[in-house]
């Protein structure tokens, strides 16, 4: 989806993609800052998710996201990421973000943390190291689809 697309084009491409990919639990905007800043355009995506019975996750790639307002006006529930883990590849920064995620989880029962585990950076290694530690402390890991089923689906 690109910013110059009309809502009719957005509707067509999202439906075509859903048919091509097959059953999905939900979708998110990965690099969709410009789309999420448009309440009309992101509203079309959220409306499709609502009608399909799938979740929408706002990755919050921009502070100017209109997704929450669009969802509110549609009466739709969306998910929003709480923490972006690897905005930098610096190990200390990633660990700090992970700690922020733990604090969010302690506060609200879960935290949606996103990152790039496949990108060759430090995140995959850090997660591999800390997974058993966090599990031993009582934390569990889930997909967003799993959260949707347990907390909001």
Segments from the language model and where they lie:
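His/Asp/Glu-enriched short active-site or ligand-binding loop at hydrolase and phosphoryl-transfer sites
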Residues: 47-94, 139-145
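Conserved, mostly hydrophobic/aromatic
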Residues: 27, 112
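C-terminal transmembrane helix-loop-helix hairpin of multi-pass membrane proteins
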Residues: 101-104, 108, 115-119, 123, ...
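Sec-exported extracytoplasmic/periplasmic mature domains
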Residues: 18-26, 47-54, 72, 103-106, ...
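Extracytoplasmic/secreted cell-surface and envelope-processing proteins
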Residues: 35-40, 66-67, 121-127
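Alpha-helical scaffold elements lining the catalytic groove of polysaccharide deacetylases
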Residues: 1-19, 36-41, 68-105
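Catalytic beta/alpha-barrel core
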Residues: 6, 28-38, 50-64
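C-terminal domain-boundary segment and adjacent tail
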Residues: 52-62, 119-153
């Amino acid at each position: 989806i690109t910013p110059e697309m009309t809502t009719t084009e957005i509707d067509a491409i999202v439906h075509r993609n859903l048919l091509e990919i097959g059953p999905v639990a939900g979708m998110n905007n990965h690099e969709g800052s410009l789309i999420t800043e448009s309440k009309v355009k992101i509203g079309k995506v959220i409306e499709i998710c609502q009608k399909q019975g799938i979740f929408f996750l706002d990755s919050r790639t921009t502070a100017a996201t209109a997704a929450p307002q669009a969802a509110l006006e549609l009466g739709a529930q969306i998910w929003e990421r709480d923490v972006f883990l690897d905005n930098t590849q610096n190990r200390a920064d990633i660990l700090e973000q992970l700690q922020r995620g733990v604090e969010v989880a302690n506060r609200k029962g879960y935290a949606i943390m996103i990152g790039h585990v496949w990108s060759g950076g430090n995140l995959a290694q850090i997660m591999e190291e800390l997974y058993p530690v966090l599990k031993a402390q009582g934390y569990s890991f889930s997909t967003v689809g799993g959260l949707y089923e347990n907390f909001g689906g």
